[in-house]
Amino acid sequence: MNFNKIDLDNWKRKEIFNHYLNQQTTFSITTEIDISVLYRNIKQEGYKFYPAFIFLVTRVINSNTAFRTGYNSDGELGYWDKLEPLYTIFDGVSKTFSGIWTPVKNDFKEFYDLYLSDVEKYNGSGKLFPKTPIPENAFSLSIIPWTSFTGFNLNINNNSNYLLPIITAGKFINKGNSIYLPLSLQVHHSVCDGYHAGLFMNSIQELSDRPNDWLL
């Protein structure tokens, strides 16, 4: 995947980037997303929720350069043209998990079939990352279906300057006739601000309200 190097000296975020990189400042935001329309459409079509969630999040991540900005393996700052999802799958026997990735296509059904194939192949492997090599342009997301939450944070030793976003969802919450998904976004402040966090959450909600635009 193409990596576009950033000329830091002439970058509009230079001062912000250097300040928050030196401070190693990350932040997380958690919102309840109304997935009522999305969930009902998914069930009507006979799909599983998790791959639809992965596809939706990846689409939003790839819509903004800020979410795709990081360091490549050569230590160069830049942004990828596209990110791929590295997501967790749970092993019901060992009660552990693995992280695998599946390339996202423009067509949801094509991605859905690839997802099912990868899960069948790698679930129960006993390895943390059974599908290798993991591409450089991969971001992390997961879902914790056993509990809901109003806040979530990952404490990372960030000596390697990991700048890509991390997305975590929780157990559905039923409120009347509506279904809500707790959703947490964790970002590095050197590349993402509150503005970008708001864009992310609002875009997730908008696409959840219009699943026919991308699900079918």
Swiss-Prot record:
Outline the inducing conditions: By subinhibitory concentrations of chloramphenicol.
- The active site of this protein is located at H189 (proton acceptor)
State the EC number(s).
2.3.1.28
**Its GO biological process terms?**
response to antibiotic
Please give one Gene Ontology molecular function term for this protein.
Answer: chloramphenicol O-acetyltransferase activity
One Pfam family from the record: CAT
Give each disulfide bond as a residue pair: none
What is the protein's name according to its record? Chloramphenicol acetyltransferase
